[in-house]
Amino acid sequence: IGLVGSEMCIRDSGLDHGEPQKILVYDLGGGTFDVSVIEIGDNLIEVLATAGDNHLGGDDFDARITEYLVSEFQRTERVDLRKDATAMQRVREEAEKAKKVLSSSSTTGINLPFIATVKGEPKHMEMTLTRAKFEELTMDLIERTAGPVQQALSDAGITAADLGMVLLVGGSTRVPAVFEEVRRLTGKEPSRNLNPDECVALGAAVQGGKLGGALMAGSQAA
């Protein structure tokens, strides 16, 4: 059974060697969203509950930006890029880049020269995207993570007040609005001590045993 990235991160960080506590792992990856409530300590990692959304992830954020850029270009230039696969791929790549930049900056420039040609005249996509606009475009996606968080807490038989830590996993958790939503949902400052992308890579690379929802922190398998 594949060892999930969040559990591997806990093991790799040594969190499982401290005092017993319950933690919530909020894992927003590229294509899926997973949340787990895990009890750790005494070299043991026990999964108390899991929930999630298999149709929610960072790719959806990219798609929202892409659609906005294409719609704005169509409005100003009267050109529908959706009919041009090559142009759309360029816009998608620019959208993903913009998402990453807006995780640390309030604005970013969109610059795609020669994105289209109309009657022999080249058209360029040049505009500014703000973090505020990005959040407006994606807030409903972020709010969709609330249901699984509440479900996992309920299934574990605890409330957010019982959590000792909230751990963010997955590159999309770098989005500031995601961080704020997790803080709102749990009433706690989410931990960014672990590299979200490294957690995912680690979990994908390592296989381990999972028996009765418990993982012995010292065991490893090829």
Identify the residue ranges that each predicted region occupies:
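Oxyanion-binding/catalytic loops of NTP- or PPi-dependent enzymes
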Residues: 6-222
